Swiss-Prot record:
It comes from the Bacteria. PROSITE patterns: RCK_C. The lineage of its organism: Bacteria, Pseudomonadati, Pseudomonadota, Gammaproteobacteria, Enterobacterales. GO terms for biological process: potassium ion transport. GO terms for molecular function: monoatomic cation transmembrane transporter activity. One of its GO terms (cellular component) is plasma membrane. Belongs to the AAE transporter (TC 2.A.81) family. YbjL subfamily. This is Putative transport protein KPN78578_08530.
Amino acid sequence: MNINVADLLNGNYILLLFVVLALGLCLGKLRLGSVQLGNSIGVLVVSLLLGQQHFAINTDALNLGFMLFIFCVGVEAGPNFFSIFFRDGKNYLMLALVMVGSAMLIAMVLGKVFGWDIGLTAGMLAGAMTSTPVLVGAGDTLRHFGLPSDQLAQSLDHLSLGYALTYLVGLVSLIVGARYMPKLQHQDLQTSAQQIARERGLDTDSKRKVYLPVIRAYRVGPELVAWADGKNLRELGIYRQTGCYIERIRRNGILANPDGDAVLQMGDDIALVGYPDAHARLDPSFRNGKEVFDRDLLDMRIVTEEIVVKNHNAVGRRLAQLKLTDHGCFLNRVIRSQIEMPIDDNVVLNKGDVLQVSGDARRVKTVADRIGFISIHSQVTDLLAFCAFFIVGLMIGMITFQFSSFSFGIGNAAGLLFAGIMLGFLRANHPTFGYIPQGALNMVKEFGLMVFMAGVGLSAGAGINNGLGAVGGQMLAAGLIVSLVPVVICFLFGAYVLRMNRAMLFGAMMGARTCAPAMEIISDTARSNIPALGYAGTYAIANVLLTLAGTLIVIIWPGLQ
């Protein structure tokens, strides 16, 4: 039996879609030196090649893909979006505006100089910025802009062509820039990271190991009684001196949880909780007492939970003000926008921040109730909230404004982005509402993006040869300019106008470009994860601004004719 693969694919859109995705994802795993192609560019290249052979896909699949992607981007940005606007994120907001605004302006100037249409110009901007939100925003606005069908088809083809030609240029140039730009300034990033670490009392070791606290029991001997000198536990401040705290005391056979007024006595058995290295550093006064094994004394359930910051008595306060150790809990990690932050006593907490805390289950629960809630380790997604806010986003996108003879529609991209932000924001404030496991959110976002990339590649593939011959060289040069010049402008603005610490600044610049590979290089150069503070500050707002940039460049373009 002979199987005509071409006829089989042309007759089955679903099969064609998943063949493109599978081949593209395989291609995306290839590496060019230290640079991995990535899923987006892999799927785009395969779809362009198959598009040249006149394979096509239903446009409804393409639209659903971009809608899912942009909605999930909003959900991820939601918890931190408003805090960046309304509190101490002014510098991060300004950096993101400078980065995105200068890139959009340069792209429009180059588009006019080279005589491109809006499709090539917006596609080049999206590729040079390695930003699929720009591509999604521009594509959605073009579809609702009232263009004639033939002009719309050409603009959409040019949009994906410009993105495909400049994406790798944008990615590689930014990675190279992240590696060598720090060496061109007077301050090296390692020194800058150490400086801010000294100022804030940070742990500069990005490879800091995290252990679960352990519990050990000791019998109070004469050395420890002499060391205590009659002071109660509150006056002794045992945790500050040893890194351990006393969880339980057995005295005269009676087991009790001590309060701050308790005084150690000869013959007491005490249960100390702390990290292994803290036990190893215990003062000889403790070690000279006999270590004991008491099943009841050591019977304690140590748990590690992720606590989401929500309550007003924690939001806006510094980490040190929580006094977690005073409540018998140990902080392991601080996570913001999926980025692990340095454990900094001066970090101001935002709604939606995640604190990984270890300690006795009862104590951890008490701390969680005080500052927020324990993240639900559930595999069940609140599909009702997901669908409801998705519908709201589509309805917002239908709103249009009329100015004389000119009409402007919000569009699906902006509507879904706003609805996603609201869902993410509400989720950060209400633990039982709108829960979406991070794995599920990542899967839907990635799948939506891959479907969208497959669709635009297949639709643009037929004309790629003509496009390469006509504008290929111009595109590569323009992509390099749009990729690097805004980064230089942003650096000058942050260094000499905002006077930011260099390590924080470079992290914020990579966040404004939403480029995780470049962020890894900055962290390696600084030998610290301190730049992650800056990256997390600009990342959420940059995702939103880049989507709006794709919409704005399409709206502004006709006025430049």
